[in-house]
A protein has these predicted regions:
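Non-transmembrane, aqueous-exposed alpha-helical and coiled segments at domain scale
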Residues: 1-189, 194-279
Length: 279
């Protein structure tokens, strides 16, 4: 059994909140850079160049890439041989509180969805814990802005809808979103499971690097097909047209009921943020 202090968790989460909001993951940066090099439409290319300049300025000045510094979605892979010395969830919330305060990040969380009222410290975080073998603890902070989150959709398709219904739903989601999610977008797509699980799969898919395909060749092929089809829609960066509507997408799948075909699309913008640390 290995002990990890609650303070170590707080320190890691605070650091990751700032890092994720000021520096994009290398795979997202590479996809954005590739897109601006290859985009043929002048207005779209100029827009991508501006996004790249903004990204560079944020990195150089340690400033947020986007004014919407997001809801702190925290994913933890916790070894079953780990003992936390203190309150685990309280340590995460305190890390978010400290990171958003020390990093001068926008406080975007309301205490109640209907009665509202800003909590003033961007807590509580949305915490997901996955138990794994061993004595490790890996924490990923993925701040999620709601311009793109609000464009996300879930649908309980019929089994008869099949792969064509699946494709149609994904493309329809991108078309309905238009310029609202600040494209070029990144898509996390879930298929299978239940109503709640498919939404989780879509969110989980956003954690996979854009240069890592689904290990199942069938779904890896679907990822390539969908990316091509989405970029042929012509929405383009910020809705100005062009061939760069989506930087990348990932599909996560799981078994489902014989009577169902759940599908969820979690839409993210070009500022798809995540930062990880292993304790």
């Amino acid at each position: 059994m290995r002990n990890i202090s609650a303070q170590a968790i707080t320190d890691a989460v605070a650091r990751l909140c700032i890092e994720a909001n000021t520096r994009l993951p290398q795979d997202v940066q590479a996809a954005l850079d590739k897109a601006r090099q290859e985009e043929p439409w002048p207005l779209a290319k100029n827009t991508l160049d501006l996004l790249w300049s903004n990204l560079s300025a944020a990195r150089e000045k340690d400033l947020p890439i986007c004014q919407d510094t997001g809801m702190a979605c925290v994913f933890v892979e916790l070894g079953t041989d780990v003992h936390i010395d203190g309150s685990f969830e309280a340590a995460i919330h305190e890390g978010v509180r400290r990171g958003y305060t020390d990093g001068y990040l926008r406080m975007s969380i309301v205490a109640d969805p209907l009665r509202r009222g800003n909590t003033g410290d961007n807590t509580p975080a949305a915490i997901t814990v996955h138990l794994v073998d061993g004595d490790g603890c890996t924490i990923t902070v993925a701040p999620k802005g709601f311009g793109s989150e609000n464009m996300s959709r879930i649908q309980m398709l019929k089994p008869a809808d099949g792969v064509e219904g699946f494709r149609k739903f994904v493309l329809e989601t991108v078309q309905l979103a238009g310029s609202n999610p600040c494209p070029p977008s990144v898509l996390g797509i879930g298929v299978g499971g239940s109503f709640d699980k498919v939404a989780y799969l879509a969110k989980k898919a956003l954690l996979r690097p854009l240069d890592v395909p689904n290990p199942d060749p069938y779904y890896a092929g679907l990822e390539r097909e969908l990316l091509t089809a989405i970029n042929e829609l012509g929405i383009g960066p910020q809705g100005f047209g062009g061939q760069t509507t989506c930087l990348g997408l990932a599909i996560e799948q799981m078994p489902t009921h014989v009577a169902g075909l759940p599908v969820a699309v979690n839409v993210s913008c070009h500022v798809t943020r995540r930062a990880s640390a292993t304790l």
